[in-house]
Amino acid sequence: MSSSKKGSDRNQIRKSLRKLKKQIGELEKLESPDRLNNVKPIFIKRNIYLKKKLKKKVKDHGIFCSCSLDPGSSTLCGSDCNCGILLSSCSSSCKCSSECTNKPFQQRHIKKMKLVQTEKCGYGIVADEDINSGEFIIEYVGEVIDDKICEERLWKLNHKVETNFYLCQINWNMVIDATHKGNKSRYINHSCSPNTEMQKWIIDGETRIGIFATRFINKGEQLTYDYQFVQFGADQDCYCGAVCCRKKLGAKPCKTKNTTLEEAVKPVACKVTWKTPKLLNSEVRETNLDASGQAWNNHSQRKICCRDCIGAYYTAQMKVLTLVVDIFQVMYEDGVTEIIDMCREVWKVVTA
């Protein structure tokens, strides 16, 4: 075979390999960190629903805009767009046109990022380009499960002595589990002084979680957000290195403030280390109810906190529903109501 023929073949092979690498590059990079543990997470671009997909019609939300093109501008729906302010993408109900820019998830302009090995926090993600404050970085995706499946998975992982799994609570009874299926967002580490945040958006009636920059991020800088860590057992050491580091992942910020409705329904990302949960003191479950519920005559409603499967507490109003003890109707701060057998739940009365 002539040297020119061999050179041509080698060039063809290189082109084929480059094309193949481009096609599977994302999957290859995602799988690499867990090979030592014989775990290969599957790369996905969209959430996979293992529970019934609750998708409301766009018109039911009543969110739309009437943005018009400003003179000399080529784009619509900037920072003053009604939909964007309410964390909802523009839809067919809006009066804006195809120039609309308030569609961060649909347009899928995912920022360039790289997987790296950190000194103390395992693998992490660094920006591979400059990112401006407020820009969409990536969607947090995984398997969407309910509390029942979440609890079952936690127990299975506990039996396997597995500690690496990733949960993001969308709302009550809906959790994104990126343990086995996800994208690069599952490797973003925690920081007590993060440069990104999770936002819960309504996209064509579907609730989705996006990660957005909270400040300008330089190329090569590690991406972080506050896990709002929820765990079972002792606090875990934090190695974020921030000046305001809380030292423990389970610790709360030093400055306290009143929880707003917006904060109450904000998604909570949890990197959980499983340990046997401590039982609440018996006095917490003391409700002062007799068999007929007479103790509630003077005040039929009380403010309580209910704990979900990953240990996060949700504030709710509880009222007597029947004369059967421990059967109540609760309404959470996001307006969702639920009938609960309180003797099967972990809860406590809010006194403050």
Swiss-Prot record:
<feature type="domain" description="SET">
    <location>
        <begin position="111"/>
        <end position="228"/>
    </location>
</feature>
<keyword id="KW-0156">Chromatin regulator</keyword>
<dbReference type="InterPro" id="IPR001214">
    <property type="entry name" value="SET_dom"/>
</dbReference>
<dbReference type="GO" id="GO:0005634">
    <property type="term" value="C:nucleus"/>
</dbReference>
<dbReference type="GO" id="GO:0032259">
    <property type="term" value="P:methylation"/>
</dbReference>
<keyword id="KW-0949">S-adenosyl-L-methionine</keyword>
<feature type="domain" description="Post-SET">
    <location>
        <begin position="234"/>
        <end position="250"/>
    </location>
</feature>
<dbReference type="GO" id="GO:0000785">
    <property type="term" value="C:chromatin"/>
</dbReference>
<dbReference type="GO" id="GO:0046975">
    <property type="term" value="F:histone H3K36 methyltransferase activity"/>
</dbReference>
<dbReference type="Pfam" id="PF00856">
    <property type="entry name" value="SET"/>
</dbReference>
<feature type="domain" description="AWS">
    <location>
        <begin position="60"/>
        <end position="109"/>
    </location>
</feature>
<comment type="similarity">
    <text>Belongs to the class V-like SAM-binding methyltransferase superfamily. Histone-lysine methyltransferase family. SET2 subfamily.</text>
</comment>
<keyword id="KW-0808">Transferase</keyword>
<comment type="function">
    <text>Histone methyltransferase.</text>
</comment>
<keyword id="KW-0137">Centromere</keyword>
<dbReference type="InterPro" id="IPR050777">
    <property type="entry name" value="SET2_Histone-Lys_MeTrsfase"/>
</dbReference>
<dbReference type="InterPro" id="IPR025787">
    <property type="entry name" value="Hist-Lys_N-MeTrfase_SET2_plant"/>
</dbReference>
<dbReference type="InterPro" id="IPR046341">
    <property type="entry name" value="SET_dom_sf"/>
</dbReference>
<dbReference type="GO" id="GO:0000775">
    <property type="term" value="C:chromosome, centromeric region"/>
</dbReference>
<keyword id="KW-0489">Methyltransferase</keyword>
<dbReference type="InterPro" id="IPR047893">
    <property type="entry name" value="ASHR3-like_SET"/>
</dbReference>
<dbReference type="InterPro" id="IPR003616">
    <property type="entry name" value="Post-SET_dom"/>
</dbReference>
<keyword id="KW-0539">Nucleus</keyword>
<dbReference type="InterPro" id="IPR006560">
    <property type="entry name" value="AWS_dom"/>
</dbReference>
<dbReference type="GO" id="GO:0006355">
    <property type="term" value="P:regulation of DNA-templated transcription"/>
</dbReference>
<protein>
    <recommendedName>
        <fullName>Putative histone-lysine N-methyltransferase ASHH4</fullName>
        <ecNumber>2.1.1.-</ecNumber>
    </recommendedName>
</protein>
<keyword id="KW-0158">Chromosome</keyword>
